[in-house]
């Protein structure tokens, strides 16, 4: 097992993701790596965007697309610490609550 995959599995475990979800996320990452024939940490945001567009254009099932998208978002945001616009920004609940007060 690569150190990167081990790190993602640790991150998913810390996040409380179910075993089945973890397996689905790892499988989605394998498909991405196989598609580009290189490690996902070496891919650009544009390459990941094109990959997701390709899934849509091929007409994969909605659930398959969502698992792929969520697994990529988890990997790039949580494991690698990359906040890409592709996945949108998450609102900071504390900042939102403070602004409302």
Question: Residue locations for each model-derived region?
Answer:
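Intrinsically disordered, low-complexity and often Lys/Arg-enriched segments
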Residues: 1-2
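N-terminal core-binding DNA-recognition domain of tyrosine recombinases/integrases
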Residues: 6-100
